[in-house]
């Protein structure tokens, strides 16, 4: 309800997210205060950047926010776009350690395999930057409720094909 109020009325300071009071923070590790603040911010803003320093637990903060929004029924499917090198080591491992009750899949391999995974019933689907271009139509049709772009600097130039593809997906004009 408070999140809905924040979207309806523009307050000078946003109302506190219920995540800080009404969430159990699952996982092997309990969040630090700054991770709770980050999760609160992300759960209140439908479009947001997270510029926390390296090593501050941004991935877990994102996962807790997504899990909280899933618990509320506000989102169902999350697409994580990240470098190939951290699909397993960071994202899938952190999902297991933070939200072990959620399902996840690595979307990598042939176009056919990627399509099958994208069409699957997973809470979190993890794909690398270049994989997005291979199955952009299927990604659009999958109707992800939340898209997380890790290390968004890979999309900083509007002249690259990566940026153009993700822009089409996000602006509902993918053909």
Annotate each language-model stretch with its function.
Residues 52:
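The Walker A (P-loop) glycine that initiates the GxxxxGKT/S ATP-binding motif of P-loop NTPases
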Residues 10-40, 44-47, 56-174:
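SF2 helicase/translocase NTPase motor core
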